[in-house]
């Protein structure tokens, strides 16, 4: 059940960083953290990742509740004893709940992490988004490793 602690840590870090941004930055304000690469940029998003489906909050409520339920079910039924699988689900669950809290309480999500590579500005994101991405990457690694084990490949 350690994976629920990971989920709680992700939610706490996500909500704490968003609270800090809301309390200390104006929307649109940018603070350079690593020159030419990393900025804290206060932004509000009422859509999904990269502002997809902006303004369709009812859709996100429904989908998120379903996804959270499915993840908890899978964690309870299948994740025990599968460390990488359970950790990946914990990161996904923490990210989903972190952004869901924002949508329910504020009808928008606080984003603030902005990275720049040369002339490319990656879409602004938050800890929950990063957690979702880490969870998905870990899940892909788990599936690849598990598939190799199943087939007996070293």
From Swiss-Prot:
Transmembrane regions listed in the UniProt entry: 55-75, 84-104, 124-144
EC number: 3.4.23.36
Record membrane topology: Multi-pass membrane protein
PROSITE patterns assigned to the protein according to its UniProt record, in alphabetical order: SPASE_II
GO biological process: proteolysis
Nucleotide-binding is among the record's keywords: no
Subcellular localization(s) per the UniProt record: Cell membrane
Protein task: This protein specifically catalyzes the removal of signal peptides from prolipoproteins.
PANTHER family membership: LIPOPROTEIN SIGNAL PEPTIDASE
Protein name in UniProt: Lipoprotein signal peptidase
């Amino acid at each position: 059940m350690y994976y629920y602690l990971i989920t709680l840590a992700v939610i706490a870090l996500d909500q704490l960083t968003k609270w800090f941004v809301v309390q200390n930055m104006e929307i649109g304000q940018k603070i350079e953290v690593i020159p030419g690469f990393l900025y804290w940029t206060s932004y509000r998003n009422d859509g999904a990742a990269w502002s997809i489906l902006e303004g369709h909050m009812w859709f996100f409520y429904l989908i998120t509740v379903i996804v959270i339920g499915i993840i908890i079910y899978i964690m309870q039924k299948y994740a025990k004893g599968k460390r990488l699988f359970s950790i990946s689900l914990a990161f996904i669950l923490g990210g989903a709940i972190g952004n869901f809290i924002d949508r329910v309480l504020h009808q928008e999500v606080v984003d603030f992490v902005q990275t720049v590579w040369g002339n490319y500005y990656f879409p602004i994101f938050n800890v929950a988004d990063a957690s979702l991405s880490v969870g998905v990457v870990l899940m892909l690694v788990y599936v690849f490793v598990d598939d190799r084990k199943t087939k007996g490949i070293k």
